Curated annotation (Swiss-Prot):
Record keywords, A-Z: ATP-binding, Chaperone, Nucleotide-binding, Phosphoprotein, Stress response
Originating species: Clostridium botulinum (strain Alaska E43 / Type E3)
Residue segments, region Disordered: 579-605
Name of the protein this chain belongs to: Chaperone protein DnaK
Coiled coil: none
Domain of life assignment: Bacteria
Family: Belongs to the heat shock protein 70 family.
Induction: By stress conditions e.g. heat shock.
Function: Acts as a chaperone.
Positions carrying Phosphothreonine: 175
Length: 616
C-alpha cells in the first residue's frame, strides 16, 4: 500500500504531512516552505500558477488571481477566467495538485490517496465538494475529518495514556470552529462542535482594509476600494499589518503612489496601533465567544471541567484572540502545537490509522448540524440531532398527508431551525408507487445513514408495497460524475502542460549553462586547444546558440548533447597530454548541464524565475 498523505486544505494556506517511521512529518514544498498559499493565478499566455508564485504577482494581476476559494465550497459560485467558468472544486483541485506534486517529490513515489480536513461546521454540500476537489486532483479521499479533531489527534498522540477533556479553538483564514473532545486510552471522542464558517483571518484583514480606505477617503476624497489594483495592495498591506501587530504595539502602513488625481500622485503613510486594531476588530473576536458557549452546553460540561485549551489556525496568533479565550476559559492556552501545521499533522495521523501504521487510536467524531426531513406544514422534523457520534444510522416511520396519495417527495434538510425553509435543503427525492389509502395509513420508513466522512445517504421504504427510493446527498451546487470526469481530464491536461513548460525551462537552462561553461573553458585553455579542435567546438557552439531560443526542444537537446561530446573529446585530448582530469577543463563538467544532475531546489528556482520573467 502506498503512502497516504494528510492535507489541511486551508482558506489562505494549505499544509501536507505524512507518517514516516511512526511519526508525522510536515512536507516542505518546492519553494522550501512548510505551508503553501491557497492561491491560483492565470497568466495572459494561459499558464497557471499555484501557491507562493501566484500570491507574489496578485497585485499586478488581480482579475485573474483567486484567493480564499474555500469560502465558496458547496455553493454555485463560479470564477470567470477569460470566458471559462471554474467551480470552487476545480480551483481547490489546482491547489491540491500542487500539494500532491510536492508530496510525490518528497516521497519519491506516486501519491493517489489522502485524508483531507474540513471545518467542523462544514455542511454536507461543502464536504462533498471537498471530496470532488480531491478526485479532480487525482486523489482518492479516503476520509474527511474535522479540523479541530485533527488538531486534537496531533496534540494527543503522545498523551494517550491520560484521560482529559480539551477545548479546540480553531480560527483560520476563513472559518472558525470550536470542538470539545475527551481523550483517554487511545480514544478521541468529540463531545460537541460549533462554529461559524464565515469568520476568519480574512475578516480581520477586511476590517483593516476598510479602516485604511476610509482614512484615505476622508483625507483625499478618493475611495481606493473602487480600484482593483489599489485594493489588492491594500489587502496585502492589511495582512502584513495584522501579522506585525501580533508581536509589535504599532506598525507603519506605507503605500507610495497608491493612486493619483489632478493634483498628482497620492501616497499612504499611516501608523496603526495594536489598540486601534483591537478596537476595529473587537466584534469579530466577540463572535467567537457564543459558539464556545454552545459547544460547552451541547457537551453538557462546564468550563471548569476543561483541562486544556488548544489554539489552532494562524489567526490565533492575534493577541486579542488569545486574551478573549483566556478570559472566557480562565486558563492559559496550551503552546504544545504549531497552529499552522497541527491540522495537517492530525490528518497524517488519521492516514496512519487507516494504513495500520498508527495503532490503538479510535476517533469518534460527530455530525455538526441536525439532519431531518420536511413534514406537513413545512416543519423540519429531526432524525439525527447535531453532535451525534458518526458513523450512525437512524430510521423513523412517517405517513401520507392526503387521502389516496401515491407518492411522496422527501426534502432532506440540515440545520437547527424549526421550519424547513429556514434550513439548508440538501436534496429532494420521490418515493412513488404507494398503494392508495386514507391519509395516515401508509407506513413510510425514512432512514438516514451518515458515514465516517459526515456524508449523508437517505432512503425511504413503503412498508406496505416494499417500494424503495434513496439518495446520496449531492446538492445541486456540487458537480455530477460527468462534470468531475471532465474536470479531471482538464486537470491532467494542465499537469501535462506544466510538465512541458518545466521541460522547456530545463532544456533552455541546460543550453545556456553549457554555452557559458564552454566559452569560459575555451578562454581559460587558450593555446592548449589546437585551432582545428577549437573550430570544431566553435561550430557546435554556434549551432546551439542559433537554435536555443527556438521552440524545437528536441533539436536543442540534440545540439546540447553534440556540443557536450565535442568539447569533452577536445578537453580529454588536452588533459591527457598533461596527465590531468578532462572534467576539470576550465571548470567544465559535461554533466553539469544535464537536468538530471541538478538538485530539485535548483529546478524550482529556475522555474520561478522563468515565470516571473514571463510576467514582465
Amino acid at each position: 500500500m502506498g503512502k497516504i498523505i494528510g492535507i489541511d486544505l486551508g482558506t489562505t494556506n494549505s499544509c501536507v504531512a505524512v507518517m514516516e517511521g511512526g511519526e508525522p512529518v510536515v512536507i516542505t514544498n518546492s519553494e522550501g516552505a512548510r505551508t503553501t498559499p491557497s492561491v491560483v493565478s492565470f497568466q495572459a499566455d494561459g499558464e497557471r500558477l499555484v501557491g507562493q508564485v501566484a500570491k507574489r504577482q496578485s497585485i499586478t494581476n488581480p482579475d485573474k488571481t483567486i484567493i480564499s476559494i474555500k469560502r465558496h465550497m458547496g455553493t454555485s459560485y463560479k470564477v470567470d477566467i477569460d470566458g471559462k467558468n471554474y467551480s470552487p472544486q476545480e480551483i481547490s483541485a489546482m491547489v491540491l495538485q500542487k500539494i500532491k506534486a510536492d508530496a510525490e517529490s518528497y516521497l519519491g513515489e506516486s501519491v493517489t490517496q489522502a485524508v483531507i480536513t474540513v471545518p467542523a461546521y462544514f455542511n454536507d454540500s461543502e464536504r462533498q465538494a471537498t471530496k470532488d476537489a480531491g478526485k479532480i486532483a487525482g486523489l482518492e479521499v479516503l476520509r474527511i475529518i474535522n479540523e479541530p479533531t485533527a488538531a486534537a489527534l496531533a496534540y494527543g498522540l503522545d498523551k494517550m495514556d491520560s484521560n482529559h477533556k480539551i477545548l479546540v479553538y480553531d480560527l483560520g483564514g476563513g472559518t472558525f470552529d470550536v470542538s470539545i473532545l475527551e481523550l483517554g486510552d487511545g480514544v478521541f471522542e468529540v463531545l460537541s462542535t460549533n462554529g461559524d464558517t464565515k469568520l476568519g483571518g480574512d475578516d480581520f484583514d477586511q476590517k483593516v482594509m476598510d479602516y485604511i480606505a476610509e482614512t484615505f477617503k476622508a483625507e483625499n476624497g478618493i475611495d481606493l476600494r473602487q480600484d482593483k489594483m489599489a485594493l489588492q495592495r491594500l489587502k496585502e498591506a492589511a495582512e502584513k499589518a495584522k501579522i506585525e501587530l501580533s508581536s509589535s504595539m504599532q506598525t507603519n502602513i506605507n503605500l507610495p503612489f497608491i493612486t493619483a488625481d489632478a493634483t498628482g500622485p497620492k501616497h499612504i503613510d499611516l501608523n496603526l496601533t495594536r489598540a486601534k486594531f483591537n478596537e476595529i476588530t473587537h466584534d469579530l473576536v466577540q463572535r467567537s465567544i457564543e459558539p464556545m458557549k454552545k459547544a460547552l452546553s451541547d457537551a453538557a460540561i462546564s468550563i471548569d471541567e476543561i483541562e486544556k485549551i488548544i489554539l489552532v489556525g494562524g489567526s490565533t496568533r492575534i493577541p486579542a484572540v488569545v486574551e478573549a479565550v483566556k478570559n472566557f476559559t480562565g486558563k492559559d492556552p496550551s503552546k504544545g502545537v504549531n497552529p499552522d501545521e497541527c491540522v495537517a499533522v492530525g490528518a497524517a495521523v488519521q492516514a496512519g490509522v487507516l494504513t495500520g501504521e498508527v495503532k490503538d487510536v479510535l476517533l469518534l467524531d460527530v455530525t455538526p448540524l441536525t439532519l431531518g426531513i420536511e413534514t406537513a406544514g413545512g416543519i423540519a422534523t429531526p432524525l439525527i440531532e447535531r453532535n451525534t457520534t458518526i458513523p450512525t444510522k437512524k430510521s423513523q416511520i412517517f405517513s401520507t398527508a392526503a387521502d389516496s396519495q401515491t407518492s411522496v417527495e422527501i426534502n432532506v434538510v440540515q440545520g437547527e431551525r424549526q421550519m424547513a425553509m429556514d434550513n439548508k435543503s440538501l436534496g429532494r427525492f420521490t418515493l412513488s408507487g404507494i398503494a392508495p389509502a386514507p391519509r395516515g395509513i401508509p407506513q413510510i420508513e425514512v432512514t438516514f445513514d451518515i458515514d465516517a466522512n459526515g456524508i449523508v445517504k437517505v432512503s425511504a421504504l413503503d412498508k406496505g408495497t416494499g417500494k424503495e427510493a434513496n439518495i446520496t446527498i449531492t446538492a445541486s451546487t456540487n458537480l455530477n460524475d460527468e462534470e468531475i470526469d471532465k474536470a479531471v481530464k482538464e486537470a491532467e491536461k494542465f499537469a501535462e502542460e506544466d510538465k512541458k513548460r518545466k521541460e522547456k525551462v530545463e532544456t533552455l537552462n541546460n543550453a545556456d549553462q553549457l554555452i557559458y561553461q564552454t566559452e569560459k573553458a575555451l578562454t581559460e585553455l587558450g593555446d592548449k586547444v589546437s585551432a582545428e579542435d577549437k573550430a570544431k567546438v566553435t561550430e557546435k557552439l554556434e549551432a546551439l546558440k542559433a537554435i536555443k531560443d527556438g521552440e524545437d526542444l528536441e533539436a536543442i537537446k540534440k545540439a546540447t548533447e553534440e556540443l557536450t561530446q565535442e568539447f569533452y573529446a577536445v578537453s580529454s585530448k588536452v588533459y591527457a597530454a598533461a596527465g590531468g582530469d578532462p572534467s576539470q577543463a576550465g571548470g567544465f563538467d559535461p554533466n553539469a548541464a544535464g537536468g538530471a544532475q541538478q538538485a530539485p531546489h535548483d529546478d524550482n528556482v529556475v522555474d520561478a524565475d522563468f515565470k516571473v520573467d514571463d510576467d514582465k
